Every structure is written in C-alpha cells, then in structure tokens.
C-alpha cells in the first residue's frame, strides 16, 4: 500500500512539538442525515458496541439507523448554537486556552490542535495538518478523565490506524487517564464551590458519569473504579460525608445491564426518600454536551421535580474555565517532560539547511530531485 509522506521536505523548516486534545465527537448539523452519518460511524466502532459484527450490522442498519437519527436530531437541535454544537465550541475554546499558554512559554515551537474521534474535525485531518506544521514529537490528550476502552482506547485505535498509513511517524506519548490528577480534582472543587457561593448548596451532590455496559467492568475495564475514585477525592476535597453525595451513571443504551445506580432512576427515587433538593455535576464530561445539557439539565431535572423534588441545580461542566485550562496545561507540561523544545531560530535553521546541502552534494552530486 502507498504511504503518506512529506513532499518537498526542506531542512530549513522548523521541527515542532505537538499537543492534540480529542473528544468524542459531534454531528455536522442537527439534521437527520447528519445524525445518521455520525451515528453510523460512532455505533459501528467495536470498542463502543462489543457485539459480533455481522449481527450488529443488521441491527444497526436495519433498525437503529432507521429510527434513532430523527429523534437524536431533535435533541441536538434543542442545544445547538449558532457556532455549532456545544461540545465543538467548548473543545475549540479549551484548545485555544492550552495553545495560548504554550505560546507564552514556548513561542511557536509547540503546536496545539483538537480533533474528534467521530465526526469533524477528524483525527486523520488534524494529524495531517500537524505533520505539515513540522510536528515531530506528539502528545495526545483524550479529554476523558476516567479511562475506558470504549472511549480512551478507541481514540488510541484511531490514531494508530492513521499511523499505519504514514511513512514518517512522530515520537508519541498518550495520556490514558487523569482521574486522580490533583489539579483536576482541585479545579472541580473550586468550580463547585463557586457555584454554591452564587446559587446556594442543596441537600445532596449527585456526581453523574456516562455509563457503560456492566460486562465491560466484569471483563476488566477500570472505568467504574476510576469514577468512584474521582468522586471520593472530590468529596474529600469538598469536605462531604458519605451521605452527602452519590455516584451515578447515565445515558444507558439498549436492554442489557449497565453500571449502576442509574442516574434517572436515582433522581426519580430520591424525593421519596426525603431528599428534596440536589446539585448535579458530571465529573467525567470535560465539556457540556447533549448528555449534560439535554439529558441531565432538562430530562433528569423533570424526573426529579415530577417525583416530588423541590430544588434542582445543574452545575455546568468545567468547559474552558480558567481553572480547567490551568489543570490541563499542567497535565500537558508534566507529560512533555524529557522532550527538548526544538531550537528554531533563523540561524539554527539556516545552519541545518547548509549542512544538509553539503551532505547531499557529497553523496548525490548534481542531483536536483533530492
């Protein structure tokens, strides 16, 4: 197979470090055709749905993609903004915040980009752009604090697949999780405290994470454990007792058993147990998206209030808040340790080009195609 290379490489071009942040993805528009395309890519990933491919193809194309895109398009339309989906907007702002911090410290020697595992901007497209910008050392940061094969490993798969098509591979580092990274815990704690200072504190804090099938845990996926560790560390930092917070799991899909307790069932039951007011925060979501804005702040709010609840306060995700950007920058800088920042002064680039030309003339005299 042909491999993608770099045409017309010149030795006076800068070498750079790259930082690529990724998130799950978003459709290109809140329309049925766009959702059908997006869901086809997302739900066909074997990391997401671990069902034998022939059987799953029939279910996906014969049933799901005929029914779900229209319903999902309506949900996305309810949260869509003029600049696109909330997840895309927040992720772009997060990348810009990290980029500005890197620029202040390293100038133009560090390139920061963002990509989506599904949809656009795609991982292959952004990797190609970074290669063309001279990235020779690459750090990948999937914005999933808690590791799961269905998210983090899927991102690794996509990057590895792209690398199989490239002739020149960069040095490569991959951050698989940061569920217990102290600056991340601190950023969440201060964010929640700020919300409480402005809006008051409810009886109980619900920490809702995206769910995964229970069988993933039984097969060794650490996601469940990492979610609970994040919750424990956050609660300790906030000074909460065990009866003052709960860890729940949302967004289940299909009929099989997922991680429990389920967020929706928990919120329906709490008022009957005497808990009349709650704060809800989603530590596993680095940015607000359909699952937080529509599912939690609208759908689950309604479940709680209709069941007898009297107060429901949704605490937004960290998004591109200064505390979150600071935590992500520290995570990036910690993982760049040991990599020398390229020296791209005009003098050093000219010297490198001169030495390369001398070697070329000595080895391939008279050749103009090298």
Swiss-Prot record:
Gene name for this UniProt entry: hemH
Entry keyword Iron: yes
Location within or outside the cell: Cytoplasm
Pfam families assigned to the protein according to its UniProt record, in alphabetical order: Ferrochelatase
Pathway: Porphyrin-containing compound metabolism; protoheme biosynthesis; protoheme from protoporphyrin-IX: step 1/1
Residues at which Fe cation binds: 210, 291
Described function: Catalyzes the ferrous insertion into protoporphyrin IX.
Keywords associated with the record: Cytoplasm, Heme biosynthesis, Iron, Lyase, Metal-binding, Porphyrin biosynthesis
Catalytic activities: heme b + 2 H(+) = protoporphyrin IX + Fe(2+)
Organism: Marinobacter nauticus (strain ATCC 700491 / DSM 11845 / VT8)
GO biological process: heme biosynthetic process
Keyword RNA-binding belongs to the record: no
GO molecular function, one term: metal ion binding
Lineage, opening ranks: Bacteria, Pseudomonadati, Pseudomonadota, Gammaproteobacteria, Pseudomonadales
Matches recorded under CDD domains: Ferrochelatase_C, Ferrochelatase_N
Protein name: Ferrochelatase
